């Protein structure tokens, strides 16, 4: 299931019926389904101490979906939007991936409607890891799908400070790319530590 739901939308999951969901999974001969823990807007679809549950959701949607999937004999893979969290990006603009001209990727700035990719060389990574840990500790997920994560050159303050601190040249694309690869490698290693 793919849905990225703004805080402006109301009655989230209001008509969800666990029995009907389970029946639909069986009727469709589904063997695996991906269910949302956190969308691109940054909202969680379950109670959380780490993030914020969607303001117009009043029950544990992913918990009910996982239970229904398992009752139907279907694997339940949990989706977390890793590289996008618009709620966090707006509150922490300095942690967004920047181009060399300091514009953002996907949207050129915060006045243009779109999502803003977050840099994994910032405190955002710790926030994301806490969400992953909470999800895996609280739910019986059969897998984890972390979306929007890849090697991406970045010129945010954190990346520039890292390069300069290591005696590297922020104007040298090879050195910026090497940092991007290191940042992604660190991200995957730290995710693996949480998952294992």
Residue ranges of each PLM-predicted region?
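Hydrophobic faces of well-ordered beta-strands that scaffold small-molecule active sites
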Residues: 1, 33-35, 76-80, 144-146
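An acidic-aromatic substrate-binding cleft motif
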Residues: 1-8
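Active-site-adjacent "subsite" loops/lids of carbohydrate-active enzymes
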Residues: 78, 82-139, 177, 189
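Short, small-residue-rich loop/turn micro-motifs
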Residues: 3, 37-39, 148-150
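Aromatic- and glycine-enriched glycan-recognition loops and surfaces
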Residues: 9-28, 49-72, 126-130, 182-189, ...
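Active-site neighborhood of glycoside hydrolase catalytic domains
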Residues: 117-196
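Short, well-ordered coil/turn segments that N-cap beta-strands
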Residues: 29-31, 70-76, 140-142, 196
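Aromatic-lined carbohydrate-binding/catalytic grooves of carbohydrate-active enzymes
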Residues: 26-61, 84-101, 110, 153-154, ...
